Amino acid sequence: MNATTSAAAYGLLAGADLEAELAQARVADGDARDAAVLERDGSASVVPLARRRPGSPVSDDAVTLSGVSKRFGARTVLDNVELGIARGSFVAIVGRSGCGKSTLLRLVAGLEQPSSGALETRGEGGGELDTRIMYQDARLLPWKTVLQNVMLGLGRGARDQARAVLDEVGLLERANDWPAQLSGGQRQRVALARALVHRPQLLLLDEPLGALDALTRIEMHALIERLWREHRFTALLVTHDVQEAVALGDRILLIEQGRVALDQPVPLDRPRARASAAFAALEDRVLKRVLAGGPGVSDHGAPHEADNVRPVGQIRWAV
């Protein structure tokens, strides 16, 4: 199912830093200079090419976490997290299993509440931030057609809108098919369409491509990136795949033992050239940092405290 907070008007991208980053010159395979910068800056938290320029405006954050901690009983899963997610940006979160990645996503979604600290979400114009989640399991209703799955919660008047979004994900011709007739990648495209038909301001992606084959994952990367640039939503991706994080993110966060251990901007032009020296150097750097850290706390084995979990009745689901 796809969870959402209260709906707010969908607005335009506000993020001068993102536009400036996307305007950087393309990093080509033979650009040894940029690759060397990535290689030699291994001890820094960010690479020089991505640092904020003097006098540049402060980001308009869609999500802000101030001293946020999350505990399940005596176990601390997130510990005093300080984080801002700029509106319109694409942030990828990586880390070992159980480090707190999915817990962070659930907090941002409003599915659970922080044990301490403050988490603020802001929609366009100061309103509420409409949020949708896409999971590894597409969670389609098998007794409804593809079109009906996309239209869930919208009513008959949204048929044209749903068909338009199906066309965007390349599945309009499968509108009357059943989910069982689709491949895994096609089912995830339907799940993506079901989220985007609501025109969310924030799209949360909880390892949505983890069960797909390598070629289908690359195709989905291109689709998600294209739709992100067209729809201008903020995206927060949780993934175990460092290459996926470099391919999609403007910024990569490493969660390690409940804390943000690395905040790495990605100073590469889009679409990302996976074979480039700079791409490979950045991927290698982040991967080495992930492997250097010890195992984190468990996301899955921790008991949930009832007073920290939002009741189901307070969450609006788009299934």
UniProtKB/Swiss-Prot annotation:
Entries under PROSITE patterns matching the protein: ABC_TRANSPORTER_1, ABC_TRANSPORTER_2, SSUB
Domain ABC transporter: 63-282
Pfam families: ABC_tran
Enzyme class: translocase
Domain of life, per lineage: Bacteria
One cellular-component annotation, GO: plasma membrane
Signal sequence coordinates: none
Residues annotated as binding ATP: G95, R96, S97, G98, C99, G100, K101, S102
Membrane topology according to the record: Peripheral membrane protein
Protein keywords: ATP-binding, Cell inner membrane, Cell membrane, Membrane, Nucleotide-binding, Translocase, Transport
SUPFAM superfamilies: P-loop containing nucleoside triphosphate hydrolases
Main location: membrane
Subcellular localization: Cell inner membrane
Keyword Kinase: no
Gene Ontology molecular function: ATP binding; ATP hydrolysis activity
Chemical reaction(s) catalysed: ATP + H2O + aliphatic sulfonate-[sulfonate-binding protein]Side 1 = ADP + phosphate + aliphatic sulfonateSide 2 + [sulfonate-binding protein]Side 1
EC number: 7.6.2.14
Self-association and partners: The complex is composed of two ATP-binding proteins (SsuB), two transmembrane proteins (SsuC) and a solute-binding protein (SsuA).
The family this protein is said to belong to: Belongs to the ABC transporter superfamily. Aliphatic sulfonates importer (TC 3.A.1.17.2) family.
Known function: Part of the ABC transporter complex SsuABC involved in aliphatic sulfonates import. Responsible for energy coupling to the transport system.
PANTHER family according to UniProt: ALIPHATIC SULFONATES IMPORT ATP-BINDING PROTEIN SSUB (PTHR42788:SF17), TAURINE IMPORT ATP-BINDING PROTEIN-RELATED (PTHR42788)
The protein's name in its UniProt record: Aliphatic sulfonates import ATP-binding protein SsuB 1
